[in-house]
Amino acid sequence: MDIRWEEILEEISKQIPPKYFSNFIAPLRFDKWENQVVHLMAPSGGIKRHVETKYIGFIEDAVYQVVGDRFKVSILTESETSSHVLKEVIQSKFDDSDSDLNPEYIFSNYITSDSNRIAFTAAKSVVEQPGKYNPLYLFGPVGVGKTHLLHSIGNEIKKKDPWKTVRYVNSTSFLNEFIFTVRQNNRESLESFKIRYQSYNVLLFDDIQFLNGGAEKTQEEFFALFNFLYDRKRQIVIASDRPSYELPLHDRLKSRFVHGLQADIKSHDLELRKSLLKSNFSEFNIPASDNLLHWLAERLEGDSRALIGIVNDLVMYKKAYEYFLLTEDKIKEIAEARFLTNKKRIGFSPDMVIDLVCERTNVARKDLLGKSRKADFIPPRHLCMLLLHDVLNVPKAQIGRIFSTTHSTVIHGIDKFKERMKSEAQWEDLFHTIKHKISFQ
């Protein structure tokens, strides 16, 4: 079958604003098709992630329009191919191909309010004086813009000084890369890994709370890398979903994070949610009055991911039906179907449930989310998992990320607590008391 990529690009261009088509779709390169999958290559991890998040459906629809058959779309970067990983690469000062920066995440489109202004100011200060606030540690719940700030720092530093080498990486990628290197059982491969990371002027490290998911050597390697960069006044920026003292990492590593600047990003307040909605609606030409934006902002949870989800739903509706059918009543209907089926629970986030369990069981948050097997901590931990899953409908995989553990451990914890409730009435009573408070908040 002939995959006519140029025609597919033309079809996609009809559906996406020119600015975004130029930045994210045009750079994609057709690689091959096999087994009903179209394989594309992206020039960077940032572009790959953005396309997978926002535009994969547009590409699959365009393939169907041109080819007349349904294909899945797979996107890889060159760095994800094994042949690239096995090379001994020490990047040139002029080569930022492995920076993994998303070019769309910049300071100018980061919307601020009281909930994130300190973190935003700290991020800009790092750009103005790299190495002065070292490390910069950003923390806050999921979906509040930590990753956006990391990329903004990197993009602005590269803009000011193209000679600087910048690397954005999350803990999962770092873990996988390190484990892959170690398994080569080759001293040269390990040295190449170390030299490459030591060569960066700026390291942007996301989701550090998951660094404990690998072998002991992974934390040791990161500790050595941190010290190497820190001693040479190279800028390090770290992001996490919790304060540094709550990280499930070695104390000697956590102690290094308090030397610099720590900035808390809180859940989005009402005005920030309105501003984000307005910006996203404008991007996709979705009509909305100020009253409608206020109505939506009041009902959405305090992070950007739920917000992006509803925008995606509206974009698909607008594409499938006529533009004029997307009335304010229809927007409300779509929003309620996706997010607002249980209005009594609006605003109750996983963080609030965790805090409530800590309060009712007199267990510190760091102990509830930690790895300790003390008898005082295990039942409250399992109670929290059950509440998150059964009452807030949080997926088990996400609960695993919250507790820095595996999907199977979450299942085991939930099952254990259900068994406990059958024989220990006080835990059953506490479960129903907290469930009632959440359900009728």
Swiss-Prot record:
Cell compartments where the protein resides: Cytoplasm
Which cysteines form disulfides?
Answer: none
Q: Where is this region: Domain II?
A: 71-99
**Keywords on record:** ATP-binding, Cytoplasm, DNA replication, DNA-binding, Lipid-binding, Nucleotide-binding
Q: Where does ATP bind?
A: G143, G145, K146, T147
Q: What is its main location?
A: cytoplasm
The region annotated as signal peptide is none
A single GO molecular-function term is: ATP binding
Q: Which SMART domains match?
A: AAA (SM00382), Bac_DnaA_C (SM00760)
InterPro entries listed in its UniProt record: AAA+_ATPase, Chromosome_initiator_DnaA, Chromosome_initiator_DnaA-like, DnaA_C, DnaA_dom, DnaA_N_dom, DnaA_N_sf, P-loop_NTPase
Region Domain III, AAA+ region: what ranges? 100-318
- Region annotated Domain IV, binds dsDNA sits at 319-441
Which cellular component, as a GO term, is one annotated location?
A: plasma membrane
A single GO BP term for this record reads: DNA replication initiation
Protein transport keyword on record:
no
Pfam families in the record: Bac_DnaA, Bac_DnaA_C, DnaA_N
CDD domains per record: AAA, Bac_DnaA_C
Where do the record's region annotations for Domain I, interacts with DnaA modulators lie?
1-71
Q: What is this protein's function?
A: Plays an essential role in the initiation and regulation of chromosomal replication. ATP-DnaA binds to the origin of replication (oriC) to initiate formation of the DNA replication initiation complex once per cell cycle. Binds the DnaA box (a 9 base pair repeat at the origin) and separates the double-stranded (ds)DNA. Forms a right-handed helical filament on oriC DNA; dsDNA binds to the exterior of the filament while single-stranded (ss)DNA is stabiized in the filament's interior.
Q: Domains: what does the record tell us?
A: Domain I is involved in oligomerization and binding regulators, domain II is flexibile and of varying length in different bacteria, domain III forms the AAA+ region, while domain IV binds dsDNA.
Give the matching NCBIfam families.
Answer: DnaA
Under the heading PANTHER family, the entry gives: CHROMOSOMAL REPLICATION INITIATOR PROTEIN DNAA
Q: How does it assemble?
A: Oligomerizes as a right-handed, spiral filament on DNA at oriC.
**Family under the similarity heading:** Belongs to the DnaA family.
Q: What is this protein called?
A: Chromosomal replication initiator protein DnaA
Q: Which organism is it from?
A: Leptospira biflexa serovar Patoc (strain Patoc 1 / ATCC 23582 / Paris)
